[in-house]
Amino acid sequence: MLERLQEICEEARAALNGACSLEELNEIRIRYLGKKGELTRVLRSMGSLSAEERPRIGQAANEIRDFIEKELAARTAALKEMVKEQKLRGDKIDVTLPGMPLPGGGKHPLTLVLEEIQRIFLGLGYSIVEGPEVETDYYNFEALNLPKDHPARDMQDTFFIGGEILLRTHTSPVQVRTMEKTAPGLPVKIIVPGKVYRRDDDATHSPMFHQVEGLAVDRRITFSDLKGTLDLFAREMFGPQTRTRFRPSYFPFTEPSAEVDISCVMCGGRGCRVCSQTGWLEILGSGMVHPRVLEVSGYNSEEVTGFAFGMGVERIAMLKYGIDDMRLLFENDLRFLQQFRS
């Protein structure tokens, strides 16, 4: 039996040295140390040995089992290290290769439209001016010919913060602030982009939206200057085929006042569902600066005239891009926003 144990030891050594994979090592472990393995069979036959032989054979069998287990562990560790090195060589990264580009973003449609508006008026010699979003009652209403008892205050739902402090309902207060700083200097040609706040929230209104106010003040400015300016703006923004229409309207801070319509961007003025079959779409309000506003701001209304206009950036964007729900502009849905990537 000692001879058989020695044979098992040599066979196991040769098998372990020739093993090239972890699967082969597992087969060797089962073949020699498993429940039906070669060494197990020898140990089970020890019952037939005499009392004198049993300790000697048992000791030899245990030594061989320990040897096989140690060799298995060593060979397993060596093969695992070899597999790891092979994987590392296969996964080698060339750090000199260019990296994968990150997905690029794009400008929001409101940003695109606002930049286009600014480009047009900067080309006409206007300057960009900004003002506070938290405004006083005086600049938001009273200085714009809207005294406290004026019924036109009901035209706007205002967010009051407390006392005379409120969130501005339009960018028009910056007109007065700029004229106060400039008077009696001439000319004044500014546009005022910014956020405004009103208590509205539906498919065509938002409690926070963007406006661009325009103001031109000088000697001998007429309504024809206003009309020519807005005609040019409409053609630049919506295309050279765009026609404009001025309708009489009312704004407390301009006199005379007019709403400005453009020929429908969907049907070209023929009449469709978007323009309610009229062929026209409203884009902004405008008018000649009211003499009282000029006087309050430090100008002599007998010598100086001016015009003003105000447009909602969301309104322009919806018409330019065919957007039918203003809320899409504020929901940050990437499926919507990705359509505007250049």
Curated annotation (Swiss-Prot):
GO molecular function: ATP binding; catalytic activity, acting on a protein; magnesium ion binding; phenylalanine-tRNA ligase activity; transferase activity; tRNA binding
Annotated binding of Mg(2+), by residue: 255
One cellular component (GO) term of this entry: cytoplasm
Record-linked InterPro entries: aa-tRNA-synth_II (IPR006195), aa-tRNA-synth_II/BPL/LPL (IPR045864), Phe-tRNA-synth_IIc_asu (IPR004529), Phe-tRNA_ligase_II_N (IPR004188), Phe_tRNA_ligase_alpha1_bac (IPR022911), Phenylalanyl-tRNA_Synthase (IPR002319), tRNA-bd_arm (IPR010978)
EC category name: ligase
Entry annotated with the keyword Magnesium: yes
Locations listed in the record: Cytoplasm
NCBIfam families reported for this sequence: pheS
Family: Belongs to the class-II aminoacyl-tRNA synthetase family. Phe-tRNA synthetase alpha subunit type 1 subfamily.
Subunit structure: Tetramer of two alpha and two beta subunits.
Name recorded for this polypeptide: Phenylalanine--tRNA ligase alpha subunit
Organism: Pelotomaculum thermopropionicum (strain DSM 13744 / JCM 10971 / SI)
Gene name tied to this protein: pheS
